[in-house]
Amino acid sequence: MRRILTCWALAALTLLGACQKHGAGADPVQAEDFVMGADISWVTWMEAAGFKFFNAAGQERECTALLREIGGDAVRLRVWVNPADGWCGKDDVVVKAKRAQALGLKVMVDFHYSDSWADPGKQPVPEAWKTMGPEAMAQALAAHTTDVLQALKGAGEDVKWVQVGNETTNGMLWESGRVAGTSAGEFVRYFHAGREAVKAVYPEAQVILHLDNGWDLDTLNWFLTLMQGKGLQYDVLGLSLYPSYREDGAYPDWTPKTARFVDNLPVLYRNYGKPVILVEFGMPAAEPDKARAALEYILLHTRDYRYFQGIFYWEPEAEARRIGYPYGAFADGKPTAALDPFGK
């Protein structure tokens, strides 16, 4: 995501699609294990900063518990290699994962392989890895992945999904891991090093390949076809969708990109044979009714897609007033109408 911060995740989207009717008398056939979750990676930082969260009745709640209360059934937690302040580092991730598991929430771990944000516009190498060549860097990536996952496993945590890289449409660990044109650089080497480390610690965990702009079929096909030719191995395709990202001082209509995202799903599944999870979703916090409508549109129009396995709202608990992030789904510490689909 392009982003700033926020972390809570009201990803309270739970089995919404599995609870609605699709036409008169028709039962939904969405994937039985469909999840509605949220990336809540900043929750511990927000708590330390004094922020509090409340349910609709005004009762104070711990953020992860509130996610569960509104219908969420999964969390996504990002990992940085050596963050300057410790937030989103190994120990912080273990704390948040323990909370989630105690509440019965499934856990997705999102490795950025950076000391801070990694996304399509920047994939900075961790400071400690900067002098390494590709072979040594692949080994460092594997060691970092193993270290974090073993810490989670040692704490008794189950992990259902692991992202090897964050929004890697242009590769990761630049420059050596950059993907451009017909070149994959060292990306496949790095991705497979992470994948093998995941499977060694959590053999049943699903490895996610994460790309941005789930509405942009041309770019997705370019990247996935290139990787198919390189023999890239992964279990799930993860996509991001921010259908009303601010442009020219205004929030554009959410419907065109959302409709394109939905239309792309059967094409991607037919071409590459992988289930899909929307691992990042966000809408302008100032327009909660539109955010709700966008989620409802996705859920309604994908209910027959068994290969579409879930949606994660990105940092819904983040508010522009509190943190400066304008695509959350809370106001004054409470979930807004944007998250209503989670509880249906």
Segments (PLM) and residue ranges:
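C-terminal motif of bacterial Sec signal peptides marking the signal peptidase cleavage site
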Residues: 15-18
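Bacterial signal peptide processing site
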Residues: 20-22
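N-terminal substrate-binding region of glycoside hydrolase catalytic domains
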Residues: 28-106, 112-141, 147, 251-252
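Acidic (Asp/Glu)-rich catalytic clusters
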Residues: 30-31, 62-71, 95-106, 150-157, ...
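Hydrophobic faces of well-ordered beta-strands that scaffold small-molecule active sites
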Residues: 36-40, 75-77, 107-111, 160-164, ...
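Active-site beta-loop-alpha junctions enriched in small/polar residues
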Residues: 41-43, 80-82, 112-116, 164-169, ...
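Aromatic-rich peripheral "rim/lid" segments of glycoside hydrolase catalytic domains that contact
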Residues: 48-52, 117, 267-273, 285-344
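Active-site cleft segment of glycoside hydrolase catalytic domains centered on the general acid/base Glu
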Residues: 89-94, 98, 119-234, 246-263, ...
